Amino acid sequence: MKITIIGAGAWGTALAIHFALHNHQVAMWARNAEHLSAMQAELENKRYLPGFKLPDSLTAHSDLDAALEGSELVMVVTSVAGLRDSVELLKQHGAGHLPVVTACKGFELDTGLLTFQVVKEVLPDNEKIGVLSGPSFAQELAKQLPCAVVLASENEPWINEMVQELNTPVMRLYANTDIIGVAVGGAVKNVMAI
C-alpha cells in the first residue's frame, strides 16, 4: 500500500519509517521544503528524530502532488493547529477522495472540533476518515519496539480492512467504531498526565 504522510515531525517520521520498514511505500510531505531536502540528503530527520535512517522505500517530497501520486491512504500527522490547512490542501490538490487518518491529538482551537470532525467539515463527502491514537512514542516506534494503538472510524468495514493492512509484528492496531471516544481520549490524556 502507498501511504502519504503529511507532516515531518518526530511522530510523522516515526510512522513513515515504521510503515516503510514493513513493506509499504511511503511518501512524506511537509510545508518546510528546506527541512525535507535535508532529510532526503541526510537520509535522516536530524531536526525531530535524529539517529534513525530513512528506509529506501520512504521518500520526502516538497511537491504535494508528487507525494500524493498513487497514494491509497493519507495520514495527517501535523499539529492540530495545522490540520485544517493540511486537509484543505488535500482538497485543493484533488485528493479529497482519499482515505484520511489523523494521527494528531487535540481539539481545534477556534472551533473546539476533534481532529476527525475537522476532516469531515473540509471533506464532507469522504466516508473513509479515521483517527490513530494510543500509548505510543516516536522514538520507541522508530526503534521498532512493540506498541498497540487504536484505529477508529465510523466506517467499520473500512477500518477493519485498514487494521488488517497496517498491522505489523511491531505495531498492533485495534479497530474501534467509537471514533469520538478515541479522539477525546487522545485529546485529554496529555492534560491528565500532567
Where are these regions (language model features)?
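Internal alpha-helical scaffold of NAD(P)-dependent oxidoreductase catalytic cores
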Residues: 82, 93, 118, 122-126, ...
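NAD(P)+-binding Rossmann beta1-loop-alpha1 motif at the extreme N-terminus of oxidoreductases
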Residues: 1-52, 60-62
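Short, conserved active-site loop motifs that form the nucleotide-linked donor/cofactor pocket
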Residues: 57-59, 171
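Rossmann-like NAD(P)(H) cofactor-binding subdomain of soluble oxidoreductases
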Residues: 61-69, 73-146, 162
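Short, charged/polar "capping" segments at the starts of alpha-helices
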Residues: 34-38, 109-110, 159
